């Protein structure tokens, strides 16, 4: 009887989680309960909890496991054995089924897409590997191969033959170890470096500086044997078979791989953005791995060439000490040159003969779609797919996901955290925003108006601040931006994109409307449709407290400033985000001198003078630095930070704005109608420009 009840309970759990009906309510385990699944394919994941009866058929083979008990099965129309869908393992457990939307692509198509990404990544890496960006590291790669004969040739004829053979093998493998270390660090740092630094609250260039220090140390060890012994001393207590020292080349490759990251082309720039926003999936990993492999093959060719020359030319074999000193000197010179960004001048002097090839293979629709994965689907957020963007009626999209990984709170008593479960009984609006985002600045007056109008009627608002730029991670900057926008409701600081990812968000702004039972009922991405959102808020408030007296809708008094015509897309100056650069030459990280092109395409920008570019924005590095912008809009805003002045030239008339303090938004054009125009912005030296936005 107990077992029968447990079976029935399991069937009910499946039904409630997957939205399907049990075919029977009570059966013994000898005749397991079944569940009817609607026609069409879906997916269910089984997660387990302790305390239920064993399944006598748990040893059935040909099962796929995931999660903790974790049977993972595709379901199609028909009846399915509950116990076989979620087999028990070794302990007594009960299972619950969580519905997960199926990938609509056929299996063959999914495999084809991954193979396409692999091919595109490999070709993109190969093109990068033969581009001018490899020139700064070529001497070190070449000499690392030439030095590989050291261990084999210096070994004395007397002594154990096995030792000489081991040294010869190590010498032969040295070029492969150098390139292997480069591929590993190149891929890992590019994919995970930004996220790791954000988690550790370290500067975004911390890994690069660590690699420069390591490069200098390796070079000094090659020149001074006593210093090399000091470097290896901390590893002396480790069993020799486990030591991976500088001499085998792997450490040198690790350092070079970090410093090789700025050479990445458009594909790796997209991967950097994916890594920073925690959208790392199979496609991103495959693209990164194949890109790193493709980029490393030309370098391996040069390393092996150095090795072959050293083996065949007697002078190399007789002067191994001099070769070590030369290798160390070149390594240190490379590190010093990278500190002062000298290789950038060499890269600018030589035309990038591979730029057009990289653009051709990186602009495909498939790649863009697969890198923009829409967040990681998990048991908490799977049912968000049931909501359509901006629907005019309430929908049911599952229990609201948790506010994960929040690094701090503002506008709460003592800045203490808020748990969504504590707000049950209230209608909750989750608003994703960033204080320098002009789209958010246009939307937030409506959110503030709703909060002021309905907070006494049962509405709670939480603003989840997910930074678009590094400076937006500073709590003081967020607090100042919130005060300027009149925000008094609680703010959750989502600096690590954890909540952003858990809600599968991709937009600034975005609203998630949650009813009094904790269920997501409406999702709106972007600006506009404020009257629809407010109508649904009022409907949920009435559902939570029938007969509640509500004030007049605030949308009648707050103007809707959402642009209705097609405007120039938001213009980013960060190396990893730039999409509409219309100037000549490469737009790469580092300091460079630019000039305007003879003509500037619509909805694009160009630079003039000396600029220092990074993944956040562009910093004026000279007194002649300027930006020319061809835009289509009524209003133009610029996000800029630092101390100095910003001169805006429009229709030949200059206007100067004083700039002081952390980066924030400044309006540079306030037009009276939508128009296509060109303007020039001249920031004083030291100002950092992040983006243009339009209204």
Curated annotation (Swiss-Prot):
The record's annotation in InterPro entries points to: AhpC/TSA, Cyt_c_assmbl_TM_dom, Thioredoxin-like_sf, Thioredoxin_10, Thioredoxin_domain, Thioredoxin_ResA/DsbE_sf
Give the transmembrane ranges.
123-143, 179-199, 205-225, 254-274, 285-305, 325-345
Annotated localization: Cell membrane
- Main location, first listed in the record: membrane
What cellular-component terms does GO give this entry? plasma membrane
GO function terms (MF aspect):
antioxidant activity; oxidoreductase activity
Q: Which UniProt keywords apply?
A: Cell membrane, Membrane, Transmembrane, Transmembrane helix
| The Thioredoxin domain, residue ranges | 394-542
Quote the PROSITE patterns the UniProt record gives.
Answer: THIOREDOXIN_2
Please report the name of this protein according to its UniProt entry: Protein DipZ
């Amino acid at each position: 009887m107990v077992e029968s009840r447990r079976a029935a309970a399991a069937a009910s759990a499946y039904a409630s989680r997957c939205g399907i009906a049990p075919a029977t309510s009570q059966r013994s385990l000898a005749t397991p309960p079944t569940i009817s699944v609607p026609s069409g394919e879906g997916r269910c994941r089984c997660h387990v909890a302790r305390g239920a009866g064993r399944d006598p058929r748990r040893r059935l083979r040909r099962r796929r496991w995931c999660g903790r008990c974790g049977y993972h099965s595709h379901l199609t129309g028909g009846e399915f054995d509950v116990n076989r869908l979620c087999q028990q393992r070794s302990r007594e457990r009960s299972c619950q089924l969580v519905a997960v939307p199926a990938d609509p692509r056929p299996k063959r198509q999914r495999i084809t897409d991954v193979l396409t990404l692999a091919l595109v990544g490999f070709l993109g890496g190969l093109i990068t590997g033969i581009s001018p960006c490899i020139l700064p590291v070529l001497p070190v790669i070449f000499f690392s191969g030439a030095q590989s004969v050291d261990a084999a040739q210096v070994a004395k004829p007397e002594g154990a033959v096995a030792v000489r053979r081991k040294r010869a093998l190590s010498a032969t493998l040295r070029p492969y170890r150098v390139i292997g270390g480069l591929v590993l660090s190149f891929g890992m740092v590019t994919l995970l470096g930004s996220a790791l630094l954000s988690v550790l609250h370290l500067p975004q260039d911390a890994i690069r500086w660590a690699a420069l220090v390591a490069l200098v140390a390796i070079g000094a060890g090659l020149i001074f044997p006593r210093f090399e012994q000091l470097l290896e001393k901390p590893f002396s207590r480790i069993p020799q078979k486990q030591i991976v020292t500088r001499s085998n080349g792997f450490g040198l490759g690790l350092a070079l791989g970090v410093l090789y990251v700025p050479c990445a082309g458009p594909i790796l720039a997209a991967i950097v953005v994916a890594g920073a926003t925690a959208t790392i999936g199979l496609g991103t990993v495959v693209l990164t791995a194949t890109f790193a492999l493709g980029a490393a093959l030309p370098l391996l060719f040069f390393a092996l060439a150095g090795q072959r020359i050293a083996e065949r030319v007697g002078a190399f074999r007789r002067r191994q000490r001099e070769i070590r000193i030369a290798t160390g000197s070149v390594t240190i010179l490379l590190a010093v040159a990278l500190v002062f960004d000298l290789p950038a001048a060499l890269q600018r002097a030589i035309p990038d003969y591979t730029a057009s090839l990289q653009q051709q293979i990186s602009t495909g629709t498939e790649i863009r779609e697969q890198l923009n994965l829409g967040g990681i689907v998990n048991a908490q957020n799977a049912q968000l797919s049931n909501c359509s963007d901006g629907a005019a009626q309430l929908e049911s999209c599952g229990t609201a996901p948790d506010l994960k990984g929040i690094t701090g709170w503002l506008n709460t008593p003592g800045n203490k955290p808020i748990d969504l479960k504590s707000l049950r009984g209230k209608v909750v609006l989750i608003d994703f925003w960033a204080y320098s985002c002009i789209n958010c600045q246009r939307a937030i007056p409506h959110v503030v108006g709703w909060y002021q109008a309905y907070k006494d009627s049962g509405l709670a608002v939480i603003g989840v601040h997910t930074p678009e730029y590094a400076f937006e991670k500073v709590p003081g900057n967020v607090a100042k931006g919130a005060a300027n926008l009149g925000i008094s409701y609680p703010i959750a600081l989502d600096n690590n994109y954890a909540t952003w990812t858990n809600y599968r968000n991709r937009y600034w702004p975005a609203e998630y409307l949650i009813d009094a039972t904790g269920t997501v009922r409406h999702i709106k991405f972007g600006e506009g449709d404020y009257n629809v959102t407010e109508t649904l808020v009022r409907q949920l408030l009435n559902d939570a407290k029938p007969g509640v007296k509500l004030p007049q809708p605030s949308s009648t008094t707050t103007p809707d400033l959402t642009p209705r015509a097609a405007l120039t897309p938001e213009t980013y100056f960060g190396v990893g985000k730039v999409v509409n650069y219309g100037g000549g030459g490469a737009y790469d990280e580092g300091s460079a001198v630019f000039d305007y092109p003879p003509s500037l395409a619509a909805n694009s920008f160009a630079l003039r003078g000396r600029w220092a570019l990074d993944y956040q924005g562009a910093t004026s590095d000279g007194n002649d630095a300027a930006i020319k912008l061809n835009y289509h809009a009524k209003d133009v805003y610029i996000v800029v930070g630092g101390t100095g002045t910003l001169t805006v030239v429009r229709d030949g008339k200059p206007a100067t704005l004083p700039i002081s303090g952390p980066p924030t938004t400044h309006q540079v054009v306030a037009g009276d109608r939508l128009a296509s125009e060109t303007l020039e912005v001249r920031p004083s030296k030291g100002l950092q420009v992040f983006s243009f936005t339009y209204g």
